[in-house]
């Protein structure tokens, strides 16, 4: 999920058996399954509606960076297929070879052979996305430039900030998108009290940890896209449901979400940025 330039502890974490259980569909938990069919689905389809007219009908090309075990991309392909939108190709990348292998198995298990042929998963780091993809796909940079309609990253962009490589990642996203293409980023909200370590820090029960210090603000998530000339369509806080929540907690929080949004939206769990590449690309 995160960058290969992060400390060795993260490489160990995201190449472990526990990572496979956490980031694949059968064992990931009820919360993420609920979100993929509700909160996340809603923002995905809203972002896709911002594509140039006729794009969905002519065949979408999708890319998810930091895709983990692939469950998000696989589910999105299924949703689009059921909704009548054609998917020409879907590509997932992650720095963890273990999770990339798991994603390939997941696609074979959950998708028909015809749909599975349209998916591919590759080992690639967020901050060197284009060059790693070129290497993995045995292709040329020119073939990837301006080739994707929709690029998304879920709970992964903060690791680029941690490595101070967020501009490199955003620049590669810009290059990969077609003019008018859309990027969507969902990640942890630094203002949320419900992240355990962050809560302990705010209550002065422990000193700030490296993870506390590395969760960007909404403005910081947005900044690299603004700097590179994207049109920022949405940048906001949303979602009160943890990925790991059980069924009961999930439905309680879902029912409370309208009230929580009304009184404390900035404290919700996720930051959302939706940015579109201009039809006429600015100088960068």
Model-derived regions: residue spans:
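A conserved beta-strand element that flanks and buttresses the S-adenosyl-L-methionine
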Residues: 152
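A C-terminal cap/extension of S-adenosyl-L-methionine-dependent methyltransferases
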Residues: 234-284
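Class I SAM-dependent methyltransferase "Motif I" SAM/SAH-binding loop
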Residues: 66-70
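Class I SAM-dependent methyltransferase SAM/SAH-binding core
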Residues: 71-132
């Amino acid at each position: 999920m995160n960058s290969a330039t992060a400390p060795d502890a993260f490489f160990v974490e995201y190449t472990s058996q526990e990572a496979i259980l956490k980031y694949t569909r059968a064992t990931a938990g009820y919360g993420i399954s609920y979100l993929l069919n509700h909160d996340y689905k809603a923002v995905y389809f809203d972002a896709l509606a911002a594509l140039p007219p006729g794009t969905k009908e002519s065949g979408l090309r999708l890319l998810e960076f930091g895709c983990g075990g692939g469950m998000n991309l696989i589910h999105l392909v299924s949703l689009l297929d059921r909704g009548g939108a054609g998917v020409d190709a879907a590509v997932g990348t992650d720095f963890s070879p273990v999770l990339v292998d798991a994603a390939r198995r997941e696609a074979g298990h959950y998708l028909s052979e015809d749909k599975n042929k349209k998916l591919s998963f590759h080992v690639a780091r967020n901050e060197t996305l284009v060059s790693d993809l070129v290497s993995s796909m045995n292709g040329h940079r020119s073939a990837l430039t301006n080739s994707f309609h929709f690029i998304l990253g879920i709970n992964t962009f903060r690791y680029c900030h941690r490595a101070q490589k967020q501009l490199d990642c955003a620049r590669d996203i810009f290059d990969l998108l077609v003019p008018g293409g859309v990027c969507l980023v969902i990640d942890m909200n630094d203002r949320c009290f419900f992240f355990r370590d962050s809560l302990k820090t705010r209550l002065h029960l422990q000193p700030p940890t490296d993870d506390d210090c590395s969760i960007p603000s909404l403005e910081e998530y947005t900044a690299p896209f603004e700097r590179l000339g994207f049109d920022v369509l949405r940048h906001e806080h949303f979602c009160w449901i943890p990925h790991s929540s059980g069924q009961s907690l999930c439905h309680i929080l879902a029912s409370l979400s309208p009230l929580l949004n009304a009184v404390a939206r900035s404290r919700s769990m996720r930051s959302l940025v939706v940015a579109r590449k201009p039809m006429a690309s600015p100088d960068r």
